[in-house]
Amino acid sequence: MVPIVGLIAKSAVNTPRLLYRYLFRCCDRLPEDAKGHYKHHVRQGFNSHEDETDPERIQQIIKKALEDADWILNKVRS
């Protein structure tokens, strides 16, 4: 089964814009006191990589961000 947050399936996240939307929707599944922190973290991550142009590097960043989001959501659920 493919995890779906909002209207975006995790497997469909292949562009920075879709990643941003996916991560923000993941933040909405966090406890109230953690939402602001992680939304700020997502924004900062995008600001720090906005000048990245190498498609291979962008895919590496997307893969790592998805792994991190899974880890955080699993941590909150336990």
UniProtKB/Swiss-Prot annotation:
Pfam families: Complex1_LYR. CDD domains: Complex1_LYR_LYRM9. InterPro entries: Complex1_LYR_dom, Complex1_LYR_LYRM9, Complex_I_LYR. Disulfide bonds: none annotated. Belongs to the complex I LYR family. LYRM9 subfamily. PANTHER family: LYR MOTIF-CONTAINING PROTEIN 9. This is LYR motif-containing protein 9. It comes from Branchiostoma floridae (Florida lancelet). The gene is LYRM9.
